[in-house]
């Protein structure tokens, strides 16, 4: 997703004290892409595979013919019911890169550790991370709820770092590296959810240049994370949004 430049809307509106309020419109993107499928990478064209799992056994063992199987493009996929029953899987336990789906765990830790009206201040590290962003600037201040919107709707890497710094300091007030503290908590939370094939190395999912590493997950683990995230009212409301405005107090 290309980097966004989000113009100021409220410079013409006078605000309290000397702060200028800025409203940033967030383009819908990542929220619509979240599903219980980790299709990384997608195969060229849809495929029907009799080796796919159907309720615990492969389709060929169940004598299910190709015309009765789903025709999907994903290399790795899983269909899980609300009760955790797995109805369908393709390479569901294969460890793959999940990119911005990483932000689901970032959101989980945020809603579990924060009140939605807490204030988050955007650091230089957050504002300059680049790639897909919510257009946050160094010194900006916004609520946790607004930062979650910046995280999930345009898949904002800036919001991911800002939240990781904020939550990391709450988890360990004495930490000298709040992001590292947050990432450690991400991995611990994943294990508690039963995610056996997941390793996080940052809060946004970037995996090149200074962010290159061995982060990975599986379609099955992504399903477990999504199942947990969807229990939260705020998360459900945010990912259901097609468009959103966030109000930011500029430095």
Features from the language model and the residues they span:
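Extracytoplasmic
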Residues: 226-251
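Bacterial N-terminal signal peptides that target proteins for export
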Residues: 9-30
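Active-site-adjacent loops and short helices of periplasmic peptidoglycan-processing enzymes
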Residues: 46-220, 230-233
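A generic structural signal for nonpolar/aromatic side chains embedded in well-ordered alpha-helices
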Residues: 36, 151, 238-239
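C-terminal segment of classical bacterial N-terminal signal peptides
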Residues: 34-43
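Preference for long, amphipathic alpha-helical scaffolds in soluble/luminal domains
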Residues: 3-4, 19, 23, 47
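N-terminal targeting leaders characterized by basic, low-complexity, disordered sequences
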Residues: 1-9
């Amino acid at each position: 997703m290309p980097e966004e430049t989000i113009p100021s809307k409220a410079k013409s509106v006078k605000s309290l004290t000397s702060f200028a309020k800025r409203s940033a419109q967030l383009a819908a993107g990542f929220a619509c892409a979240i599903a219980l499928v980790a299709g990384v990478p997608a195969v060229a064209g849809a495929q029907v595979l009799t080796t796919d799992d159907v309720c615990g056994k492969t389709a060929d063992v169940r004598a299910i013919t190709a015309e009765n199987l789903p025709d999907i493009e994903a290399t790795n996929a899983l269909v899980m019911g609300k009760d955790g029953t797995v109805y369908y899987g393709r390479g569901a336990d294969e460890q793959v890169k999940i990119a911005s789906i990483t932000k689901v765990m970032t959101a989980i830790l945020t809603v579990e550790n924060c009140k939605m009206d807490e204030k988050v201040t955007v650091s230089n590290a957050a504002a300059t991370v680049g790639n897909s962003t919510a257009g946050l600037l160094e010194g900006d201040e916004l609520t946790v709820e607004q930062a979650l919107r910046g995280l999930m709707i345009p898949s904002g890497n800036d919001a991911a770092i800002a939240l990781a710094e904020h939550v990391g300091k709450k988890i360990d007030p004495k930490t000298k590296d709040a992001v590292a503290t947050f990432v450690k908590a991400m991995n611990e939370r994943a294990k508690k959810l039963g995610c056996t094939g997941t390793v996080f190395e940052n809060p946004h999912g970037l995996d090149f240049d200074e962010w290159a590493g061995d982060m990975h997950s599986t379609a099955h683990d992504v399903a477990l994370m999504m199942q947990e995230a969807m229990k939260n009212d705020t998360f459900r409301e945010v990912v259901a949004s097609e468009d959103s405005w966030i109000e930011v107090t500029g430095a």
